[in-house]
Amino acid sequence: RQRGDGLSRQWLQRLQQLPYVFQGEGWVATHAGFDDSGRPDLHIREPFWDHYNGRYGRVIVGHTPRPAVECQGHIVMIDTGAVYGGLLSAFCPETDAVVQVHGPRVISESPAQQRELATRLPC
């Protein structure tokens, strides 16, 4: 049993109660994107924005790490790979402000890094 188990359970319960989508005037934020019916899809990997018609206004998404915050049409992609040692990024759709901070440590390695590490010898 680890020291943070109780706290982790409390946060998990709290996070499980949060909505999958946050909406404001002219924008919506979701983890990964939308399926064909417009429902949030937490695991989508293909670029849904290629077919997005703008019906929700600007869409703020994470899920797929990028070197910097990027915009493509109505889509703002804010995942800058904090879990892999990149920056943690936040975006305010009302002001267009981006806030970034360095994470405290690398928690995981990206799939690309894992493949690269797996093909190189340590000597």
Features from the language model and the residues they span:
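Acidic, His/Gly-enriched loop-helix segments that form or flank divalent-metal centers
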Residues: R1-L88, P93-E116, L121
